[in-house]
Amino acid sequence: RVDCLFDDNYLKASKNKLLAKYPILKDKKIILYAPTFRGNIYQGFSMLPFDGEKLINSFDENTYLIYKLHPLLKNICLPQHPRIIDMFNEDTHELFALSDLLISDFSSIVFDYSILNKTMYFYVPDLNDYLKDVGCYVNIDLFPGKICKNIDELIQGIQKNEVGNLEAFKNIFFEYQDGKNTKRVVELIYDILKKSL
């Protein structure tokens, strides 16, 4: 699913496509907020409280906040602000190309985003509860960005440009970084089928 993120032509075309659709974002700093859901099928799904207005008001008029919520959160109301844009229906990988930095939490998209070597922040005010109740695939000490337990820590981290070790994170989770993973899988399946006949 990530081969396209190694393709500079795809990234450029994706960014240009979205800028044509949202010309107000041209030459702006774009913060992508893409959290995973909380809850479950029995209790319902929800999103962590996130003060997007406070965040965006902490930056100048050249900064925009775009939301890309998890598909299970499609009915969440977002703050009404001229520099906050709901991009629920846009392709996630195309938004990666458009954005300058990512705010997420325990979403698996952080793995994909790391390919682009762009800054990430982890907004997890429920960190201890989440780890206790749900758990995490990865030791959070390996996360390639500042872990923020409240909106003020997040704003401060972005303002100070506090960054993590993206290269190390990417190298742990992507053995191959050449955009040919799909080709390898197809060849492997072909070889297995060929041997079984």
Language-model region placement:
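Donor nucleotide-activated moiety binding/catalytic core segment of transferases
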Residues: 71-111, 116
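Catalytic binding pocket for nucleotide-activated donors in carbohydrate/polymer assembly enzymes
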Residues: 108-174
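Charged helix-capping and loop-helix junction motifs
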Residues: 45-52
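Catalytic donor nucleotide-activated moiety binding site of glycosyltransferases and closely related
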Residues: 33-38, 56-87
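Short, solvent-exposed loop/turn segments at secondary-structure junctions
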Residues: 2-5, 36-40, 71-74, 92, ...
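C-terminal alpha-helical cap of glycosyltransferases
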Residues: 178-197
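A nucleotide-sugar donor-handling region in carbohydrate enzymes
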Residues: 1-42, 166-168, 196
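Structural motif
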Residues: 30, 64, 100-101
